[in-house]
């Protein structure tokens, strides 16, 4: 499964960013192959529409699930129709969150 995880940094010990639209980085992780792509969020400094634009970025990257601390209703309205599962209330290091996802410990909204 292809995950989009919000992160505060671009290293394996980075914490999950509690913000979706204005997170610093997105980690795109393939849970099958283990491949990872780290993207600096181009929408983080936008004055408006960051959530929608970040959601559109996740759709364009073909992610199947988004893992974040919080997400706004506008971003959800982009992700949900695209069939992307949303996991909120996520905390901890990105690498730990990937392991928790793989073990089935996370619940969708």
Where are these predicted regions, by residue range?
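C-terminal structural segments of small proteins and small subunits
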Residues: 73-109
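Compact, glycine-rich, soluble single-domain proteins
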Residues: 39-64
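Domain-level signature for proteins that mediate thiol-based redox and metal-cofactor handling
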Residues: 7, 12-14, 65, 80, ...
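N-terminal first-folded block
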Residues: 2-43
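Conserved SAM-binding loop
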Residues: 67-68, 86
